[in-house]
Amino acid sequence: MNDIILTSQKLYKSYHDGTSTVEVLKGVDLAITKGDRIAIIGPSGSGKSTLLHLLGGLDKPTSGLITLGNVNWQKINEKQRCQLRNQQLGFVYQFHHLLPEFTALENVMMPLLLAGMAVKDAEEKVINMLEQVGLKPRLTHKPAQLSGGERQRVAIARALVHQPHCVLADEPTGNLDEATASKVFDLMLELNKKMNTALVIVTHDQRIAERMDRVLVLHEGSLYARE
């Protein structure tokens, strides 16, 4: 059985800046398997977020191949990419990106409703998910009524509620104080293990990186395992 769920092969990404071309990624190869815990570290501006966006189908590479399951990102249209993302990937960012006018329950229901799940079934599933992240008493609270750590836990619940194959997280604890960041990260690892969902985290926090199974360094466009 092939447990590889997301791959990049010979991935290049460059941007044109006036008369010059900036090469951000230079032939990046990466294979992510079920249940993986991967940290991607590197200097600011090295292209870590760019790589995450490419893996998630949020941006297109200059050249190279990205596959999610057996699907080539570049061979499908935007509607199909959205459907595939919603089915198989979860995203967590430094800023929670919760919709301010909706409650925690409603925010986490969004990916399920977009996938066509009935409201009653989605609500039941979300209540269970929010209970797992310790927020059942906060179901009807809007983002402004939640602490920073609680908002990020809602974002994690939203990323995991549809049981994706892989979660891509970009500095998920970057806006939190040390104690809260540690609790949020503990929760992510717990759910990663419980759900066997691959977890790929871009981080500057060495303490977080040390707790992952693999630490990859992105430097001058190349991705390699840290020695």
UniProtKB/Swiss-Prot annotation:
Keyword Membrane: yes
EC main group: translocase
Single Gene Ontology BP annotation: lipoprotein localization to outer membrane
Domain ABC transporter: start-end pairs: 6-227
Membrane topology, record value: Peripheral membrane protein
Alphabetical keyword list: ATP-binding, Cell inner membrane, Cell membrane, Membrane, Nucleotide-binding, Translocase, Transport
Pfam families registered for this protein in UniProt: ABC_tran (PF00005)
Superkingdom to which the source organism belongs: Bacteria
Molecular function as annotated in GO: ATP binding; ATP hydrolysis activity; transmembrane transporter activity
Enzyme Commission number(s): 7.6.2.-
GO cellular component: plasma membrane
Annotated compartments: Cell inner membrane
Binding site for ATP: G42, P43, S44, G45, S46, G47, K48, S49
NCBIfam families hit by this protein: LolD_lipo_ex
Family: Belongs to the ABC transporter superfamily. Lipoprotein translocase (TC 3.A.1.125) family.
Protein name: Lipoprotein-releasing system ATP-binding protein LolD
Organism: Legionella pneumophila (strain Lens)
Gene designation: lolD
